[in-house]
């Protein structure tokens, strides 16, 4: 699997996607992911939604803030032979970091 938008310093492929998800889940143990739109055909799946959680763990080197924050996300997957072959994902992490007080407003 090819990840076209890996997190900075993340490994490529499935392992990198899993590690990024584990880091995010550790930073937001009560993470709730809401799907707002899902469109699919035989070759592509596109998803948009919102992630919300309370920052109780380290996030990108920053200590926990205890604040709740949310961010919009968009994911697109290319499917080949019934499996995810490619992934593109975009999250409003800057907006989330501002809500947590980790970036200026």
Question: Regions from the language model: what does each represent?
Answer:
Residues 1-105:
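C-terminal and inter-domain tail/linker signature
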């Amino acid at each position: 699997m090819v990840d076209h938008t890996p997190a900075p310093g993340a490994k490529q492929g499935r392992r990198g996607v899993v590690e990024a998800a584990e880091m995010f889940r550790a930073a937001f143990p009560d993470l709730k992911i809401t799907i707002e739109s899902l469109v699919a055909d035989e070759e592509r799946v596109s998803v948009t939604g919102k992630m919300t959680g309370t920052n109780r763990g380290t996030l990108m080197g920053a200590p926990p803030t205890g604040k709740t924050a949310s961010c919009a996300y968009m994911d697109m997957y290319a499917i080949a032979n019934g499996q995810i072959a490619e992934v593109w994902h975009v999250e409003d992490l800057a907006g989330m970091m501002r809500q947590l007080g980790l970036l200026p407003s």
